[in-house]
Amino acid sequence: EKMKEVMSNFFVESFVGNTSTHYYSGVELRTATCDQTDVAEVGFVGRTLLNAFNALEYGEQQRRTDLVTNAYKIFDSYLQNGFSETGFFNEVVHYRRNFVESVHSIRRQSEGVYALLHFLNYERLQGRKHPEWEKRIKSMLDMFLRLQNKDGSFPRKFKDDFSIVDKSGGSTPSATLPLVMGYKYFKDKRYLASAKHTVEYLEKELISKSDYFSSTLDANCEDKEASLYASTAAYYLALATKGAERAHYAGLAREAAYFALSWYYTWDVPFAPGQMLGDLGLKTRGWGNVSVENNHIDVFIFDFADVLNWLAKEYNEKRFSDFSQVIS
């Protein structure tokens, strides 16, 4: 709890409230100064909407009205000013440079919808309703159905008119999560059918070939996050299905998890004398690498620890939960 309290200071010091969409600053951050930057990003590195949900939930638990107030300001500002003409998120906005990135990614769009469905479900449980947000998110999920290819994949990048910029399907599993969540929240079976179709693609093109690629956005190559997302996508469908279907998805989650774990360090990398991280005593065991292009450690984990703990129980395979503890 003490560590959460310390980390919650991020929500205070990074909050930017003088732009058309309020956000938590963190993209392009200079670690020497931690000064606020002009970049508002919905998913990927910025994760502004998921951070807002985390700040709201934690703020209410701790009776921190400052965190709660700012979280609602972010959600309200994005509802009013955070969408493109077609209705996708303006996923990256550069305020001082005065431009919005015109190319959308299924990764950031999916992570934005994922965050909003967490927010809406939490608010529903508290007896609070947000019909305008529900309308927006349902519209986005419907656009996902339109964007999905016949083979079940989603294009990695696209424009506001649905024209394709990067047809690679490696980012597909990022869409599976909000589709399953949308099915649960809106009780719309089309979203579940779409989610199942994504995993048909994943099984055929990624999991069966052990070829996981193009999920991260700072490179376009084989990467950790494609396997991590594939495992998590299959896990979500296992939770949403029963019987033989559930068992099949669980098996896919396990197979992809084995590959994802190969990206995580099982040892502490030695540093040369004088290197800052070595001098600070950084231990790399449990940290993940990123991709074959970006060879550095990375904090990305999110749902995957839950997936590992679930797999440990599902298959009585304790090494999954053991390594989840190492990562945590």
Question: Model segments located where?
Answer:
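Non-catalytic carbohydrate-binding regions of carbohydrate-active enzymes
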Residues: N9-E13, V199-Y212, T216, T241-S328
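Solvent-exposed loop and edge beta-strand segments that line ligand/cofactor-binding
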Residues: R30-T48, Y95-E111, R156-S174, D211-T232, ...
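Active-site lining segments of carbohydrate-active enzymes
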Residues: R96-V100, H118-K189, H197, K204, ...
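Aromatic- and glycine-enriched glycan-recognition loops and surfaces
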Residues: T33-D38, G43-E85, N98-S110, E123-D142, ...
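Low-complexity, Ser/Thr/Pro/Gly-enriched N-terminal "stalk/linker" regions
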Residues: E1-G43, Y72-K73, S77-H94, K138, ...
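Extracellular/surface-associated beta-sandwich interaction domains
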Residues: E1-V12, R47-L56, A240
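Well-ordered alpha-helical scaffold segments within catalytic/enzyme domains
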Residues: L49-T65, E111-K129, S174-K189, Y229-E245, ...
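Extended, well-ordered alpha-helical scaffold segments
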Residues: K2-S14, R63-N81, L125-R146, K187-K204, ...
